[in-house]
């Protein structure tokens, strides 16, 4: 967070304000909340790190030796409130449950249900005791479907808002403060502005503190800034940016070693962490792409239903029906258009995919996020722990004037090696192992060295593991060469020195040193080459400088190593004084350089390459140093070999950056300080203009601004991260992806998905599954909607031609919630038709889940053939029973007259009302069976949208089971005794099953020919009109 940018003083806490201003300028709550959120997005104004100690003391009215008085502290606590984070307003569980019951598709089904109850009510009031109860049953079933599906969805997604709870777990419980000159342990809630606080290794920092004294203090800022290495702290202001200066320690970060004393400059919500917490909890998430698609689908279905309903309402009035009958028809047509089983089908399909993804280490917290990942067009990825292994590892060595590469892979299996027989390596390894404060935690002997946990900072731990693996057990080395004196590393000296007794001469001592390479070289007057000592010369200094620049340019942390065999007068028992040096610290012998980096994960380069093939832009957004960020970006392929930054081109051509042509720049590394001064238009221009982008040294607010910039340009954005600093961006993203192992609780709560193995490569798997489920949902919806036409047309012809009802309401329910359900769900198991990772991400504005082409295919083509099959069977059965098709026209009023028991058929036979109804229900059963038979073909053709079935094959076992299940269920509904009473379904003659079979074959042949033409003439008329 950079100073110098004027913001409202919302982050400024006053230790001694005299009164609280009343809020006379009252604004509407929503506007005020939006304004507060915009303030939180801005960088914090802070100048405490620049103040002298006297100015600091005066600003906070505190004695820097004795601290605040107990009375003053109590006054400030009363005025400013406790040092806690304000919990956000949480959504009650009952509201979440209601959203599942009444949101999206459920609303359509509730409308259908209410219309059914209305129709039944009208029937009851008109027909009294003879009222048809079909609409009552349909209304009850629709309500039950919504409630059961809603409960299922709520159960799948049930998660309380625990974002602030996870922040609370990060807050330390006790703090050591100095008040009235006395040290006292107090509850962290009671820490106030201006308090003098002491922090030691192992403590969590209780507030934002300006350091006034420190001894070897290092803090782990990784959760805030993304820096993977502990940062040293001292009283001096070392940077304009308060996040980068060394004299401030932040609330909830960990002090890993040393001690520090300082003055509290911010508490609770006003701390950097508090602002992130407020920002995260204040953000609202937009609709997921799949929610938008379902809303679009509802609009289409509603429009079709209302259009048909209103059209036939007026048509029925024209044909002479009463207005009461016309209203009943209107309601019936609208309800018939509602695909009752689709809500359950979509929910189950998403759930199945979520479970499949969980087996591949992608834990989805929100079902709709399953598809969102497939729609992703931009991934904003954190570096530390996501693209990298989150462990410092030795990457290169430089000794004997040669750079050697070490094995940085997670499995240590690349076989990279270096000359371990060199005497120089013998010295270098001993210095790295002995002049080292890191150690292995006990009882880990059975674990591989790379998997063992250590005590000590990241760089020393990396050296410890490397020496243990490449040289010899460090513990044995330390036993044989006991340490007798030490000067720990500090930011002023920039070196660490230790003195040891020699293994082969127990009376002599050796002085070992490591640290910043330029400092180490200053101590040296000689150097080792192939184990021999030579005087330091200009050639060696030039070689050293070149190696240092090369390794530093790779974004690696470079350390220099040297030693000195102390003269014989420093024999065993000599009392070394490290305060007032009584031993030589010059004329040391330079041994070499070792560089370390947090290396990329093995699978990441391949994953980034797959993302690029899939048309997904991968942007690195990190708090780490630009050189390190750029090096990792190049090693994983975020910046590809073919593309160069302006700096790369300038260096290659030996020209200034201003002379580089903008057309030749394809990649860019943007520093947080540059981003701070950009407006949204400039940021948008960078996001549009460059293919490969790295943002380095970014603050949490800037990460959020980058995500919002991508979304402004129409991208579906996925954000990956593991730290607290990532949580605002994770929540704002279309899909937030947190790390399961290294991720903080806060990031996991803010995210929609968790990578259980912390592997960026798992995201590619998730994208593939997301794209596949979108394709398969299209197929499921196409299959489900097709049967709507043979369900609606009987009702329409019943009105227009006044024939006996060909298909009843109960039978429609048996299709939608019975025979169609398992086959529709089985399409979720369908394998992709082609490499779905080779195509561009779908355009949410044009590539809809349900489009006019899908509706045209389902309703206008396949659905019509299915309706013909049903009517053919219907008319065959009635003809066999004596009623020829032409004689059925206009017969409905007589057919449904309960008092007419001598209705004559075509041949003069008389039929009672009961006999007519048995034939009618038999026809309805046959119509139902016909739909099942033509749905066989529909299911098979829905397996693919472009490929031939003969290429795709019938390997989907769940789909084969679905075919068998719907056939057996249809047979059971027809032939089980009692169904004539329960569902008005009657047994059929076997030959009536075959009436629809030719239509089923016709559907299959028609669709295979259509797909063949589409494949032969890509982009042609047929593809434009029918490829959904």
UniProtKB/Swiss-Prot annotation:
Its EC number is 7.2.2.13. The keyword S-adenosyl-L-methionine does not apply. Mg(2+) binds at residues 722, 726. The modification Phosphoserine is found at residue 948. One of its GO terms (cellular component) is sodium:potassium-exchanging ATPase complex. It catalyses: K(+)(out) + Na(+)(in) + ATP + H2O = K(+)(in) + Na(+)(out) + ADP + phosphate + H(+). InterPro entries: ATPase_P-typ_cation-transptr_C, ATPase_P-typ_cation-transptr_N, ATPase_P-typ_cyto_dom_N, ATPase_P-typ_P_site, ATPase_P-typ_TM_dom_sf, ATPase_P-typ_transduc_dom_A_sf, Cation_transp_ATPase_P-type, HAD-like_sf. Residues 1-36 are annotated as: Disordered. Residues 87-89 are annotated as: Interaction with phosphoinositide-3 kinase. It is found in: Cell membrane. It comes from the Eukaryota. The active site is at 382 (4-aspartylphosphate intermediate). One of its GO terms (biological process) is intracellular potassium ion homeostasis. The chain crosses the membrane at residues 93-113, 138-158, 295-314, 327-344, 778-797, 808-828, 849-871, 924-943, 957-975, 991-1011. One of its GO terms (molecular function) is ATP hydrolysis activity. Disulfide bonds: none annotated. Specifically inhibited by an endogenous cardiac glycoside, ouabain. This is Sodium/potassium-transporting ATPase subunit alpha-4.
């Amino acid at each position: 967070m950079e100073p110098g940018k004027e913001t409202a003083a919302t982050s400024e806490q006053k230790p001694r304000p005299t009164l609280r201003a009343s809020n006379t300028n009252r604004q509407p709550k929503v506007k005020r909340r939006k304004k507060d959120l915009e303030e939180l997005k801005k960088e914090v104004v802070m100048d405490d790190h620049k103040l002298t100690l006297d100015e600091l003391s005066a600003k906070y009215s505190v004695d820097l030796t004795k601290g605040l008085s107990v009375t003053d502290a109590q006054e400030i606590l009363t005025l400013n409130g406790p040092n806690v984070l304000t919990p956000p307003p949480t959504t009650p569980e009952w509201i979440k449950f209601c959203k599942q019951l009444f949101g999206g598709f459920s609303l359509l089904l509730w409308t259908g249900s209410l219309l059914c109850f209305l129709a039944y009510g009208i029937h009851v009031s008109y027909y009294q005791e003879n009222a048809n109860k079909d609409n009552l049953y349909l209304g009850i079933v629709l309500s039950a479907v919504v409630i059961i599906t809603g409960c299922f969805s709520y159960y799948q997604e049930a998660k309380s808002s625990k974002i602030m709870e996870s922040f609370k777990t990060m807050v330390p419980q006790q703090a050591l403060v100095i008040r009235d000159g006395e040290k006292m342990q107090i509850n962290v809630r009671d820490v106030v502005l201006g308090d003098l606080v002491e922090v030691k290794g192992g403590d969590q920092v209780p507030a934002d503190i300006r350091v006034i004294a420190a001894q070897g203090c290092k803090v782990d800022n990784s959760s805030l800034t993304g820096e993977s290495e502990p940062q040293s702290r001292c009283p001096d202001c070392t940077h304009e940016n308060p996040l980068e200066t060394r004299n401030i320690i932040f609330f909830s970060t960990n002090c890993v070693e040393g001690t520090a004393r300082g003055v509290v400059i911010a508490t609770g919500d006003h701390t950097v962490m508090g602002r992130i917490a407020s920002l995260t909890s204040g953000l609202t998430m937009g609709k997921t792409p799949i929610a938008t698609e379902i809303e679009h689908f509802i609009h289409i279905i509603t429009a079709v239903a209302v259009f048909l309903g209103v059209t036939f309402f007026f048509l029925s009035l024209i044909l002479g029906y009463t207005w009461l009958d016309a209203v009943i028809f209107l309601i019936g047509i609208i309800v018939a258009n509602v695909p009752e089983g689709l809500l359950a089908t979509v929910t189950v399909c998403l759930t199945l995919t979520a479970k499949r993804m969980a087996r591949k280490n992608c834990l989805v917290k929100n079902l709709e996020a399953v598809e969102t990942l497939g729609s992703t067009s931009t991934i904003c990825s954190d570096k530390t722990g996501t693209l990298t292994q989150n462990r410092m590892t030795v990457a290169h060595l430089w000794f004997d004037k040669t750079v050697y590469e070490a094995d940085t892979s997670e499995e240590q299996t690349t076989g990279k090696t270096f000359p371990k027989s060199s005497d120089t390596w013998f010295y270098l390894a001993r210095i790295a192992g002995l002049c080292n404060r890191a150690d292995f935690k006990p009882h880990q002997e059975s674990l591989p060295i790379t998997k063992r946990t250590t005590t000590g900072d990241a760089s020393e731990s990396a050296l410890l593991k490397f020496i243990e693996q490449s040289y010899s057990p460090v513990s044995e080395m330390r036993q044989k060469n006991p340490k007798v004196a030490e000067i720990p590393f500090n930011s002023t000296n920039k070196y660490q020195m230790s003195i040891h007794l020699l293994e082969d001469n127990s009376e002599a001592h050796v002085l070992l040193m490591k640290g910043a390479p330029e400092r180490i070289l200053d101590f040296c007057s000689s150097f080792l080459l192939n184990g021999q000592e030579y005087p330091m010369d200009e050639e060696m200094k030039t070689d050293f400088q070149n190696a240092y620049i090369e390794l530093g340019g790779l974004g690696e942390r470079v350390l220099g190593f040297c030693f000195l065999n102390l003269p014989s007068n420093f024999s065993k028992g000599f009392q070394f004084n490290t305060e007032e040096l009584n031993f030589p610290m010059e004329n040391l012998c330079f041994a070499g350089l070792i560089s370390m980096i947090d290396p990329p994960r093995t699978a990441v380069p391949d994953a980034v390459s797959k993302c690029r093939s899939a048309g997904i832009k991968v942007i690195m957004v990190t708090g780490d140093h630009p050189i390190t960020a750029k090096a990792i970006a190049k090693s994983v392929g975020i910046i590809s070999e073919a593309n160069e930054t302006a700096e790369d081109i300038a260096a290659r051509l030996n020209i200034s950056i201003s002379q580089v042509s903008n057309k030749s720049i394809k990649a860019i590394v943007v520093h947080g300080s540059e981003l701070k001064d950009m407006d949204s238009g400039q940021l948008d221009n960078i996001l549009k203009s460059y293919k490969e982008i790295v943002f380095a040294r970014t603050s949490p607010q800037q990460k959020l601004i980058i995500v919002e910039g991508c979304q402004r340009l129409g991208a579906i954005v996925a954000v990956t991260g593991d730290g607290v600093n990532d949580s605002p961006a994770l929540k704002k993203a279309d899909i937030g992806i947190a790390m399961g192992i290294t991720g903080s609780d806060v990031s996991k709560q803010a995210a929609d998905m968790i990578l259980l193995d912390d592997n960026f490569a798992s995201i590619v798997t998730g994208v593939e599954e997301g794209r596949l489920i979108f394709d398969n949902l299209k197929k499921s919806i196409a299959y489900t909607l097709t049967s709507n036409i043979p369900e609606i047309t009987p009702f329409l012809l019943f009105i227009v031609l006044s024939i006996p009802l060909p298909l009843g309401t109960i039978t429609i329910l048996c299709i939608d919630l019975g025979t169609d359900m398992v086959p529709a769900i089985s399409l979720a198991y369908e394998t992709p038709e082609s490499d779905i990772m080779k195509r561009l991400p779908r355009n949410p504005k044009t590539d809809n889940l349900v489009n006019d082409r899908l509706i045209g295919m389902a309703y206008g083509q396949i659905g019509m053939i299915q309706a013909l099959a049903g009517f053919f069977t219907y008319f065959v059965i009635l003809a066999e029973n004596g009623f020829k098709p032409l004689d059925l026209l206009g017969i409905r009023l007589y057919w449904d007259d309960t008092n007419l028991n001598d209705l004559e058929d075509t041949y003069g036979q008389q039929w009672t009302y009961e006999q007519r109804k048995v034939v009618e229900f038999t026809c309805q059963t046959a119509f139902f069976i016909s739909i099942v038979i033509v749905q066989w073909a529909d299911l098979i053709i829905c397996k693919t949208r472009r490929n031939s079935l003969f290429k795709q094959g019938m390997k989907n076992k769940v789909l084969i089971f679905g075919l068998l299940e719907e056939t057996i269920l249809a047979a059971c509904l027809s032939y089980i005794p009692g169904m004539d009473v329960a569902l008005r379904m009657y047994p059929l003659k076997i030959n009536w099953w075959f009436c629809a079979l030719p239509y089923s074959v016709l559907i299959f042949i028609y669709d295979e020919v259509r797909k063949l033409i589409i494949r032969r003439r890509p982009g042609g008329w047929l593809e434009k009109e029918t490829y959904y």
